[in-house]
């Protein structure tokens, strides 16, 4: 199976998982990226089964609206049963690295509100130790050099993602060469740097369920 076919399979598996638990008042949190796009397209086949969605990026909001799915502001929603999103890496504890698409801050906010965070990914994203994928950090623009110096002190090699401005008007530093053996601690350390909005470690609030597309089919993993 191609990578896109694996993504399509996990996206469909996520829809199959949440659909029986939705009703006409349900609002679904939806992530950002290529795998999340497959989820949106699969979910759209059942748009009468739920009320609408909260989007983690402008791009996701546009795709949802294109399918005729109502998109709500998070501030107007009292609860989210599910948040479904992809990841750049996951470990066996379902700690994630996200933010390859630069939507990490809004993704993290929506994930924090959701009762159940379902991560969907192809099998290549499951790794023994996080950090081979550079860790994205969203930064207030004027603090970019200061934050980069602090990230070097933490052992990383930050690279400015040129030409990228987040939906929040900020910039991204991608931190290379990190061996992330304690993701919860590192997430807190980076977020404590003045000028950091947030970073792409989802460890304080990891995924609850990982649906992994493999050549043998979709595997369902809960945190070890």
Curated annotation (Swiss-Prot):
Reactions that this protein is recorded to catalyse: aldehydo-D-ribose 5-phosphate = D-ribulose 5-phosphate
A GO term from the CC aspect: cytosol
Annotated residues that bind substrate are located at 32-35, 85-88, 98-101, 125
GO biological process: one example? pentose-phosphate shunt, non-oxidative branch
* First-level EC class: isomerase
Its keywords, alphabetically, are: Isomerase
Active-site residue list: 107 (proton acceptor)
Pathway assigned to this chain's UniProt record: Carbohydrate degradation; pentose phosphate pathway; D-ribose 5-phosphate from D-ribulose 5-phosphate (non-oxidative stage): step 1/1
* Main function: Catalyzes the reversible conversion of ribose-5-phosphate to ribulose 5-phosphate.
Quaternary structure and interacting proteins, as annotated: Homodimer.
Q: What is this protein called?
A: Ribose-5-phosphate isomerase A
- Originating species: Pseudomonas putida (strain GB-1)
């Amino acid at each position: 199976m191609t990578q896109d076919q694996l993504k399509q399979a996990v996206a469909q598996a996520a829809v199959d998982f949440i659909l029986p638990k939705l009703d006409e008042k349900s609002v679904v949190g939806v992530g950002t990226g290529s795998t999340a796009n497959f989820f949106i397209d699969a979910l759209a086949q059942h748009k009468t089964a739920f009320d609408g969605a909260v989007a983690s990026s402008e791009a996701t909001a546009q795709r949802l609206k294109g399918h005729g799915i109502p998109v709500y502001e998070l501030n107007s929603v009292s609860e989210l049963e599910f948040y479904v999103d992809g990841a750049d890496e996951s470990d066996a504890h379902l700690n994630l690295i996200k933010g390859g698409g630069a939507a990490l801050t809004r993704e993290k906010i929506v994930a924090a509100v959701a009762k159940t965070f379902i991560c969907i990914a192809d099998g290549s994203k499951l790794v023994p130790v996080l950090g081979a994928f550079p860790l994205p950090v969203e930064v207030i623009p004027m603090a970019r050099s200061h934050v980069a110096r602090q990230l070097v002190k933490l052992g990383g090699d930050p690279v400015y993602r040129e030409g990228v401005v987040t939906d929040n008007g900020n910039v991204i530093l991608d931190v290379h060469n990190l061996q992330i053996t304690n993701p919860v601690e590192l997430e807190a350390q980076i977020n404590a740097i003045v000028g950091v909005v947030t970073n792409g470690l989802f460890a304080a609030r990891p995924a609850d369920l990982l649906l992994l597309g493999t050549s043998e089919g979709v595997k369902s993993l809960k945190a070890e």
